Amino acid sequence: MINRMYVITLLSVLPFTACGSAQGGEKAEAPEVYFIREITPQNMVRIYEALERPATGKVAVKLSTGEPGGHNFLKPELIKDIVTKVGGTIVECNTAYGGGRARTQDHLKAAADHGFTAIAPVDIMDADGEVSLPVKGGKHLKENFVGSHYPRYDFTVVLSHFKGHAMGGFGGAVKNISIGIASSAGKA
């Protein structure tokens, strides 16, 4: 099961440690937000280190590998240092809307074409199906269907880029983790 989840966006790092207490009806604490002036591989590592919460166990690095032929993804040369530092495996689930990442073999090709397989292993977590995770205290959801490989990871680092998304409004860290680890049934 996942111990802790951290979201690292281009301009800030936002610990999601308050989520558990918020689900339980307790008042959540305001998160700390870290800013950097220049987005570099070194500053990505610096902002991660500022959390003082090292990734432990088997580490998933959730990001978007981008659509085939597209350019809307974090460049591997920007994130390589942080992925290497945490010893991470890049993880995603197949898309539910068709396109070049709807089938595992095509998804892996897109990841390779965009340079991600050159910096770390890539795991398409729903390649072997899905699992149901309980949602504690959920108002609208009692369970969430995610890729069957997700429970293999002990720690998740989420690297996100903010964007306008034709199908779902704005996309960023919350969309990256919610839709990005969901199986096709979990996206429905």
Which ranges hold each PLM region?
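Hydrophobic h-region of N-terminal signal peptides that target proteins for export
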Residues: 12-18
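N-terminal and secondary-structure boundary signal
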Residues: 6-8, 19-188
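N-terminal secretory signal peptides that target proteins for export/translocation
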Residues: 1-2
